[in-house]
Structure formats: structure tokens, C-alpha cells
Amino acid sequence: MRSIIYVIMATMVSLTMGTGCAQAQDKALDKTTEVPKVYLIKEISSENLIKIYEALSRKAEGNVAVKLSTGEPGGHNFLQPSLIAPLVQKVKGTIVECNTAYGGGRANTEAHLKAAADHGFTAIARVDIMDADGETSLPVKGGKHLKEDFVGKNYLDYDFTVVLSHFKGHAMGGFGGAIKNISIGIASSGGKAWIHSAGQTKDISKVWGNLPPQDDFLEAMAEAAKAITDHCGDDILYINVANNLSVDCDCDSSPEDPRMGDIGILASLDPVALDRACTDLVRLSDDHGKIHLIERIDSRHGMHTLSLIHISEPTRQEAIS
């Protein structure tokens, strides 16, 4: 059976307009701006990861960072190395991560590299824990909560970023996809605390007992993502794999088992359109198990970051074989 690529058209044209926070008041929406596309292939395979990457028509060149989650020890839903290896190797990518801010098995570089090795990632590519030698900051233009985003120092060594995200639920954000992966994921350990506290502290010993209102955290996460998109310009692309759809993130050492079936591989040059497409497909699914993931998303107000985005009805195109 030949794969089908769905091209989902969105009226949202930028992360700025989509989040409703960073620079939302900057400019009116330009009606002539190109509408972003989201591609979907239902069958999840290494071959189709490469096919959907090529459909984006944006070549990853130079020193390429592949941002993904190596998964917390004890977890099992993260993207498997056997699935992603051909794509990572095709782009000659380095798998990049930053240390966590909540303790656990990836809170320092030595433990994080061990987790990456135990999960099979070091066998397919070089793994760079980008904040092993410190952090640097990127400006957040027009941010409500953040004026700068603290990222792993080594991130500046890369020319292009392939954002390869496992779409699933998340205990704090409601769901995790491309936006979470480039915001909290690229943030240093202290930068993660900075986002979670909506710009109040980088001290990981203080953040968890003094969390801000939920919407402030979600807006800060969007602002940090905007810092990454501004930094990268056109040297970035986004792929979400919507499988193992647990309500819990890959940062959870004991995630709940998925209650609904896999959706497929989605890709876009626009992270907001991509994450919105994933959440739409969860809601449109005929799988009764979706109620658990929807409850997780909505109970955390997870759509707040995407609340100004309006996705039109999907159109279909047959994939090039």
C-alpha cells in the first residue's frame, strides 16, 4: 500500500502570532504571508522518516544537530534508535540534549551520557550534552516573561537543527512536541528552571516549590521557543513522531502505557502548525483511548500556546513513490 501525505493548511504564519505572548502585538497578520504546510505519513518507519524529511525540501547541511529526547532511565516510549538511525545518519547529525532540572537519571552529564548509551543512542551517532561546559543566552524579542533564553553552550556550534520530537502527553505542559523540544529541550539545566519559573529563577533547588501560574509557564515556554526560531532562521525543520501516545513524557521514569493507537509521522517548517496538527489528529481520532490524552492536554491548559491558531480542513496528496 502506498503511503499518503496529508498537507494540512494553517492560517497561522509564525510562532509569534501563534503563541499570543511574545511580540503578539508587534504587527498585524499579513494576509499575503505563505500558509504553512504539515505533512503526514501514517505508516511509521525509518524509510518514511527520510521520505517526510525530503518532502520539506529544506536540506540539513553543515554541522547538524538532531534534537531529540534520549529518555529517562526506566522509560520506554522514547523514539527508538533503530527507527531514527537512518535519518540521523543521512544528515550526518549529532544527537543533542541538555541536562535536566528535576534530578533523575539525566541531571548531570555523566549520568545523561550513560542513559543515552543504555538506550542505544550512542551506537548510532555522537551524542552531545550541550550544557556540559556551561550555557549561553539567546535574546527573546518582545517577551512578556523572558528577556533571554539560556541554552546549552555547545548549541552555538551547530549550523542546522533537525527537531525530531516524540509527540505525547506531558505532566506539566499537557503535551510535548516540537515547541517543548526546542524550548525546554534546548535549554540548559538552569534554563529549564528559568522557563518553568517564567523567568523568576535559574536555581533548580528553588523552582519546584515556587511555580508560577500555569499560563505563565506555558507562555514562557513559547517565548523560549521563539528565541530558538529567531536564532535559527531557515536553518531548522521539525518532525513529530506520534506513536506510543502515553499521557506522560519521556522524561518520566514510569510513564503510563499508551491508551490509544499510533497516528503517524508529521513534519513541517512551522513548529506551531505541526503541534496543532498533532493535537487536532488526536481529537479527530476514532480511537476511544484518546480521551485520556485529551484530558491530559486540556487539564493542563496545554492548548494555550496554540490558542490563536486555526487549522483548516486537511487536503490530501499522494506521496511520491
Task: Give the positions of each predicted feature.
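Positively charged n-region of N-terminal signal peptides that target proteins for export
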Residues: 1-5, 278
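Bacterial N-terminal signal peptides
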Residues: 7-16
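Boundary at the C-terminal end of the N-terminal hydrophobic targeting segment
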Residues: 22-26
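Extended, low-polarity segments enriched in aliphatic/aromatic residues
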Residues: 30-85, 90-308, 312, 316
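Hydrophobic alpha-helical segments, chiefly the membrane-spanning helices
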Residues: 320-321
